[in-house]
Swiss-Prot record:
The RNAP catalytic core consists of 2 alpha, 1 beta, 1 beta' and 1 omega subunit. When a sigma factor is associated with the core the holoenzyme is formed, which can initiate transcription. One of its GO terms (cellular component) is DNA-directed RNA polymerase complex. Disulfide bonds: none annotated. One of its GO terms (molecular function) is ribonucleoside binding. SUPFAM superfamilies: beta and beta-prime subunits of DNA dependent RNA-polymerase (SSF64484). PROSITE patterns: RNA_POL_BETA. This is DNA-directed RNA polymerase subunit beta. The keyword Transferase applies.
Amino acid sequence: MLQRPPHRESFNDKEEIIDLPNLIEIQIKSYNQFLQADKFPDERENIGLQEVFTEIFPIKSYDEKTILEFLSYNLGVPKYNPEECIRRGITYNVTLKVKFRLTDETGIKEEEVYMGTIPVMTDKGTFIVNGAERVVVSQLHRSPGICFEQERHSRGNVIYSFRIIPYRGSWLEGAFDTNDLIHIYIDRKKRRRKILATTFIRALGYSSNSDIIEEFFTTRKYKIKNEKEFAKLVGKILAQDVVDEESGLVFGKASEKLTTAMLKRIVDAGIDVIRIAEDADETSPVIKMLAKDPTDSYESALKDFYRKIRPGEPATLSNARSAIMRLFFDPKRYNLGRVGRYKLNSKLGCEINDEKLQTVTLDKEDVIGALKYLIMLKSGSEEASIDDIDHLGNRRVRSVGELIQNQCRIGLARMEKIIRERMNLFDFSSDTLTPGKIVSAKGLSGVLKDFFGRSQLSQFMDQTNPIAELTHKRRLSSLGPGGLNRDRAGFEVRDVHTSHYGRICPIETPEGPNIGLISSLSSFAKINEFGFIETPYRIVREGVVTDEIEYMTADQEEQCVIAQASAPLDEYHMFAEPICWARYKGEQFETDTKNVTHMDVSPKQLVSIVTGLIPFLEHDDANRALMGSNMQRQGVPLLKPTAPIVGTGLEARAARDSGAVLIAHEDGVVDYVDGLKIVISPDDNRLEKRTYLLKKFIRSNAGTCINQRPLCHVGDKIKAGDVIADGPATDKGEVALGRNVLVAFMPWFGYNYEDAIIISEKLLREDYYTSLYIEEFELTARDTKLGKEEITRDIPNVSEETLRNLNDDGIIRIGAEVKPGDTLVGKITPKSETELAPEERLLRAIFGDKASDVKDASLIAPPGTEGVVMDVKVFSRRDRLSKTDDELVEEASKLKDIQREYKSNQAQLRTEKHERVGALLLNETAPGNIVHRRTAEIIVDEGDLITQDLIEALEKESVEDLLMPENDIYTTLRQILHDYEIALQTVETQYKTQLEFMRKGDTDLDPGVIRQVKVYVASKRKLQVGDKMAGRHGNKGVVSKIVPEADMPFLSTGQTIEIILNPLGVPSRMNMGQLFETHLGIAAKHTGITVKSPVFEGFPEEKIWEMMKKAGLPEDGKFFLYDGCSGERFDNSVVVGYIYMLKLSHLVADKIHARAVGPYSLVTQQPLGGKAQMGGQRFGEMEVWAAEAYGAAHLLQEMLTVKSDDVAGRTRIYESIVKGENLLKSGTPESFNVLIKEMQGLGLNVYTEAVDDS
């Protein structure tokens, strides 16, 4: 029978309303949208790579006679599979070919141009770059759009301001000053130039005062009939200039206050109609600004604007106009993005639809709207509010696709300049211009290479265990280009915000300088099309909680009253009580259930996946839960992993989505199983048998072992989606990072002082915490100036004993035991010949010593290496000239076999395609015309009966050349033809790769490398004193003593305790979850079941005591123990139970280090520091004080001179040791010389003088 995950008993059998989404969807979906590899070129949406090409192209030459247009792009198929790329140390990528159309004086030319390679994401959401798996972490950054802020001025009054942040381009800011005037700033960080808001509005096209007043105020026409009307208008603001049409005399300008005298002059002139700004007065900011404004027309405002942003340059009208166009109205230089436009319109209350979202530049209306809102804020209007920049409505996620898209944009923008230059410099008289001659592939592939290799967001994947891998892909970072700076980020940015609920985990974040800047997505969170994080809620209608799900962003959630998932419901899905706890605008309060609009889908939607794996999380202090979350990622995969007795129910899902386990793709029956592969016959007879290859003893990024073990047997019935093989740190398809061990919380001879852990020898004997490590050693033989390096067994001046494990080629045999200093691969390098002395030449001539012109450059096992050689891989180039006749004959025979296989595969694919197309179309009536794209010839007429001949005519054409209407039959036909072309491409790539390998060997080696050898050494690490262990509740400690099983305390049944923890580690740390887990663990173990205690809905205390009683155990969970040494009973009863403990990747064997001799620092001449540098321990300031306190003068002198940086003294002491003398004559420490040089560098004439001893 297939071993499925065991059923876990739960106290609360509430069904989940909604399944967890795919946990690595954030990576896969984003990259698929960027690449759109599965879509036909003409069906691709204008997003991702397609969008970048359409933005940059068409490119015109400076004289606009030559135009280069982008038509489509095509992606090849990968040369090797991901496993092979890791093995060879190369990048998993595909070729990118782009079809361009060039139009010039000679005509139109179309050509497909090779544009380099582009890395491809694996099924697990990772990239393989130079043989290492990497993850591109999603970035959390400030969303484009508009935000309104307030700050207190030094005088005490509040200053209001707004900021329009584009996706690309100049920032536009507006702020009140202390005189209630609004000034506009452009790129405030770069230059502090301020422009009066009305001047800026005029420069945008609102030329007159009346235009500006019309935008900001309600205006109305007044007829002056009598004295009463006359008196009513005094003190009002004019909305239009009052001009005598005949004489042209101006009686009052727009924005001026009407006085009695002015009105009298107007009436006397016979003018009886004037326009007034209804809601304006002298204190209004706009009226104040118009009074102060030095400009009065569009032209003067433009010039004034230009003088401010480009001081010192001549302010002509055309310059000014093009400057403002470039800054805000040119889509190539200024882009709000769809998200920026969405945020701007929603804040200013404008319409949001697809058409509006396409407007990516700034509008005049946007600036007017922002200024109006700012004035409303100043006036204290309830409709206007300040933005919280830490709210998730104002922060968005840039996922992998968007990050790479931005890099492609940079690469293509560089390429655009090169293309223009080439168009200009091309000599049309001597040659014909084609796209291939002006398009260079370097721009794009160079930028991508740089991004994957150097960017802060492209990270070497944490592959310690499946949970570490999964968490790394779901990580959100506020750091990186365009993000925050670790040193300048304040407390507010790092803090937990109410809008994080259900979106970002409040617990999982690193300790240290990155706290709060790096976080993790919550378990149910998704990212929407604008990059905002959404979380699901159940909709509540008239008090009834429906199963309808609505995903909401932090902004949308602000308008809703949301009940908790734990609120009790009756059988009709109505709230059981009239009052419940709910959230509104981030605040928790009790409310009437009638007001509730939504309800949480699950209590665990608050936390991330790894935090959701901690049982009884609700009983742990947040600081310890944080440590528990982080330490689960450091758990080492064990030799015999066991799933926890007390889980949370997320174990199986986490294992599945991490990619550690092997999953069946379709229903079927197991035909064959062994340690290397599983063969399944599908239930659908049309499909071939599917072979699943298992990963065997592969080295992970962290040096741990990746090994898959089959869970099924021959004859088992398999359903699609079943787990058919376990991976590292999984047990029957569930995550299993550690082991269940019998624990006692008690002190034991002081060995568990300060969180130390005592373990029984039984854990070592039964390999509870034994793990497998794999180290990789690499050696390359190159072609040097002096000759070729050679990998060989024939090494000068090396004993046969040293070479005993090397084969004839000089490479260590598989299975050999390795110790530090052993030769793994023998290599000799030519060394430069020096002129020999005559007598030396004579000796050489007599004895024929040829070995002296090469030196030994073998690969030696470094200190600390112990284990067994488990694999050796050799890669080499093949030179046709160096092959023997036999090798050439063998090669010819193999080439024939490869060609035969290639032709057979091609024929099989053609037959398969023919059968599928025949089954779909033969003797059917054509549902529409099928037309050839280039020749416009009709291949199939609508209404025709489709015959075998028509099918053969269709099959001859490429799917890209066929134009057919949208309907079910033709969509299926396109898919069949597309699948065939991809399969054919894959077969061709494999064929070419095999041919290349036969003729030239491994061509992927770096230039100059002839041969490369990789040796893999596996070592078994048992638990030892000094290793770090931890539970899931942040209860960490170091193994202090391994006690013989006979000496461990034991129960009355004779069962010995396996691990002893300090009871003082619980109360002050407030992680009571470990006690609940211990009690429930022993109850479940004695009942023979496994249990799940999901976060925030776990087993209550009463239920645990009930289970203890049922299992016949003491109700308080305390047992009397007996001393293993004396056999006497301890006085007090002790908490005993089963706890899940992990061994962490901080192993003492990797940390312990000693130095006898080794390298010294160049400047100070002191030994280097750290294990990697073979460094020493510093005898520091405090240690010197301690020695001084004892008056140990001779010891101190030795420590600070000859044992450290006294160069001459070091040599002398060495000589005296060799001669057997006991002399110490110390000189000057080098660090003293450094100090003198530094003082001399400051201009102080400091020097040492020799003093006469007498």
